[in-house]
């Protein structure tokens, strides 16, 4: 039951040397892909680290925290807003297939047009970045339109960065719950040198 998982899952600071099955970790990452994400865009990537030298470098980048220095494996959750156009096209293709399979024939064309407008035009515009200027343009444009009808107005570049991070956090939480169900403990880490982690 979910309550059992929630009661079991804790941020563990010191790991035993009990071997961890890498296939189980990969399976839990597949479950994490099922987490909800904004517009199903999944603008994140999971990097499963098992190499000893890379683990040591990550532990150093994590400021020597015990949960990092004793971990046999790590997963780095990376936001990937740069994939927005590619992911929008992929989701639009899935939507089109779903509409053709499940929608009444007389409603298909309108639903396909709505999907093309949303995933083909709106989302690429909303997720695009350009030194803060595109966010300012979006904020101004959407703010003006919202005077006349309800409209999403939290669309600055900072707002969209938050959206991507929230979706990634949902995937990370789903992963931690899946690991708990598999009988493993986890610890989310934030205190780190992100420049070193990126290397």
Regions from the PLM with identified roles:
Residues 1-199:
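Acidic, surface-exposed loops and disordered segments
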């Amino acid at each position: 039951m979910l309550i059992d998982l929630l009661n079991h899952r804790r941020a563990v600071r010191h790991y035993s040397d009990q071997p961890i099955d890498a296939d189980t970790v990969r399976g839990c990452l597949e479950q994490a892909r099922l987490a909800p994400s904004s517009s199903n865009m999944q603008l994140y990537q999971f990097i499963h680290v098992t190499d000893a030298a890379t683990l040591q470098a990550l532990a150093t980048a994590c400021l020597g925290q015990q949960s990092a220095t004793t971990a046999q494996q790590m997963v780095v959750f990376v936001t990937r807003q740069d994939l927005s156009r590619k992911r929008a096209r992929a989701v639009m293709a899935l939507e089109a297939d779903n509409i053709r399979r499940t929608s009444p024939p007389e409603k298909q064309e309108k639903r396909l047009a709505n999907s093309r407008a949303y995933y083909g035009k709106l989302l690429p515009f909303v997720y695009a970045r350009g030194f803060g200027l595109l966010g300012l343009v979006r904020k101004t444009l959407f703010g003006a339109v919202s005077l006349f009808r309800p409209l999403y107005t939290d669309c600055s570049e900072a707002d969209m960065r938050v959206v991507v991070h929230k979706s990634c956090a949902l995937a990370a939480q789903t992963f931690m719950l899946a690991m708990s169900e598999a009988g493993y403990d986890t610890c989310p880490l934030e205190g780190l040198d992100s420049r070193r982690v990126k290397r």
